[in-house]
Amino acid sequence: MQPSFTPSGGKWLSIAVILLVIGLVVGFAAGRFTAPIQQSKELNTFAAGSLKYALGNDFNPEFNNLTGIKVGMTFSGSISGAKEVQAGKQYSVFVSASAPVLYQNLINNTHYASWQIVFSANEMAITWTNSKYAINPSWPYWFENITKNSTIVAASNASLDPSGFQAIETMKLAGILYTNWSDPFVQMAFNHNESLFLQYNKAYNTWFEKLGYKANDSLALYHQIFISKYLNHTTKLTTVEIGLDGYLTSGAADYALTYVSQAINQNLSYYKSATGGNGLPIWINLGSLNKTIDQFYEQINESGPAWDNVGNLPGAPILYSVTIINNYTSPYAVQYVYDLITQMGQHYLAMSRFDPLSQPFGINISNMPKQLQAVVTPPPSYLPVSAYE
């Protein structure tokens, strides 16, 4: 008996083709051929903790929207981050809250990076959340508030985070500013008004003599906060500045020494002048990019007590810098750095009260990718080399 249906020649041909395709697929699966797999667009980046809001909340989402590149971020102290790179942590982009920290740990006599770009400044500030500890803008002697034996001050540990040694530098500079009229920089800071200087000098000496220091001891302010109060458990050190707000909001500290940008981003109150600016003068807040003031910064160094020390580099303005790590370079790293140091990055940094440089400057420019060389200049001649190396 004949079957009720017989496939035509065309049908048999179709079946043969299908079987051939199946055979090829099985062959591919067996490993005889590997098709290219489309890689996701990702970038692994380290950044100083103080950039968590400007980058993590604002810049990175916009960068992802525009480029499709997903940015994996680690925020922490720049010094501890540099140690991670040295230990083999695979970051493509590294952003530091201190250009000298980046240079000394990742460029100088090392193989981790070969250039850096300085793109923003910042300022130190005195912050609080409890109005009980508010410092009135009309009150010029802020050092009394933070050095009382009964008040608790928090700062970052200088051995892990730049804001720690920058707080040390600020206190050392203030000590010189209020004690040494013979210093020509101090005279300039007071517009050569000796009677005004003497008002501050009298208040400084009267206060610190009560605490057991000699008259015109320029290190009294630094010593009281970072040695005496620390030993009395009324100065607390943390690993990174982004955790200082927790000390304030929990009541574990009355004041925190951190950046103006942190005060803005974390809704902290901070000491202001009568005109609404930073109450810590430019001569001590490390926010200057002025040759004369930066020379004043150089008179002190970053060294602290054994438990809060990173080295002895000269004082310098707070300068943020970025590089691409040599061994783990993502193809998207150059685009990220370019957008960070130009218009889009400048916009979001300014929103967080950083002070982005309208003209970023580079160190070892010839080692940079060509796209980045086009948007940087050499370091300005008025800046001491110690400010970025």
Curated annotation (Swiss-Prot):
Keyword check for Signal: yes
Q: Which InterPro entries match?
A: ModA/WtpA
Q: Name one Pfam family in it.
A: SBP_bac_11
Stretches of the chain forming a coiled coil according to its record: none
What span is annotated as the signal peptide, if there is one?
1-29
SUPFAM superfamilies in the record, alphabetically? Periplasmic binding protein-like II
Alphabetized UniProt keyword annotations:
Signal
Instruction: Please cite one Gene Ontology biological process associated with this protein.
Output: molybdate ion transport
Q: CDD domains from the xrefs? A: PBP2_ModA_WtpA
Question: One GO molecular function term?
Answer: molybdate ion binding
Write down the PANTHER family for this protein, in alphabetical order: MOLYBDATE-BINDING PERIPLASMIC PROTEIN, MOLYBDATE_TUNGSTATE-BINDING PROTEIN WTPA
User: Which family is this sequence assigned to?
Assistant: Belongs to the bacterial solute-binding protein 1 family. WtpA subfamily.
Question: Which named protein is this?
Answer: Uncharacterized solute-binding protein TV0544
Organism this protein belongs to: Thermoplasma volcanium (strain ATCC 51530 / DSM 4299 / JCM 9571 / NBRC 15438 / GSS1)
